[in-house]
Amino acid sequence: MSGGSTGERPFSDIITSIRYWIIHSITIPALFVAGWLFVSTGLAYDIFGTPRPNEYFTQERQQVPLVNDRFSAKQELEDLTKGL
């Protein structure tokens, strides 16, 4: 028995159709614009809770926040974040 058809359109038919390109000429650029707005407005930083590029180092804390001893990590993290 040979392989049967799944009833789906072949991919070559899809990407050569005018309908495909009309839809995707709008949706693909819209996704890029939406992503750019998501990051440039700062909404991505607010949603994911990451610091903005100018918030990594404050005037009071200029050192890199590294944890050096894994057994006292909790105390080191509390010391690093007490000014936040």
UniProtKB/Swiss-Prot annotation:
Signal peptide location: none
An example Gene Ontology molecular-function term: iron ion binding
Subcellular locations according to the entry: Plastid, Chloroplast thylakoid membrane
Domain of life: Eukaryota
Main location: plastid
Membrane topology annotation: Single-pass membrane protein
Residues holding heme: H24
Cofactors: heme b
Disulfide bonds: none
GO cellular component terms, semicolon-separated: chloroplast thylakoid membrane; photosystem II reaction center
Keyword annotations: Chloroplast, Electron transport, Heme, Iron, Membrane, Metal-binding, Photosynthesis, Photosystem II, Plastid, Thylakoid, Transmembrane, Transmembrane helix, Transport
InterPro entries: PSII_cyt_b559_asu, PSII_cyt_b559_asu_sf, PSII_cyt_b559_CS, PSII_cyt_b559_N, PSII_cytb559_asu_lum
Annotated transmembrane regions: 22-36
Cofactor remark from the record: With its partner (PsbF) binds heme. PSII binds additional chlorophylls, carotenoids and specific lipids.
Pfam families (alphabetical): Cytochrom_B559 (PF00283), Cytochrom_B559a (PF00284)
Residue ranges that the Swiss-Prot or TrEMBL entry lists as coiled coil: none
PROSITE patterns: CYTOCHROME_B559
Keyword hit for Transcription: no
Keyword Metal-binding attributed: yes
GO process terms (BP): photosynthetic electron transport chain
Record-linked NCBIfam families: cyt_b559_alpha (TIGR01332)
Role summary: This b-type cytochrome is tightly associated with the reaction center of photosystem II (PSII). PSII is a light-driven water:plastoquinone oxidoreductase that uses light energy to abstract electrons from H(2)O, generating O(2) and a proton gradient subsequently used for ATP formation. It consists of a core antenna complex that captures photons, and an electron transfer chain that converts photonic excitation into a charge separation.
Subunit structure as annotated in this protein's UniProt entry: Heterodimer of an alpha subunit and a beta subunit. PSII is composed of 1 copy each of membrane proteins PsbA, PsbB, PsbC, PsbD, PsbE, PsbF, PsbH, PsbI, PsbJ, PsbK, PsbL, PsbM, PsbT, PsbX, PsbY, PsbZ, Psb30/Ycf12, at least 3 peripheral proteins of the oxygen-evolving complex and a large number of cofactors. It forms dimeric complexes.
Annotated family: Belongs to the PsbE/PsbF family.
Identification of the protein by name: Cytochrome b559 subunit alpha
Record organism: Guillardia theta (Cryptophyte)
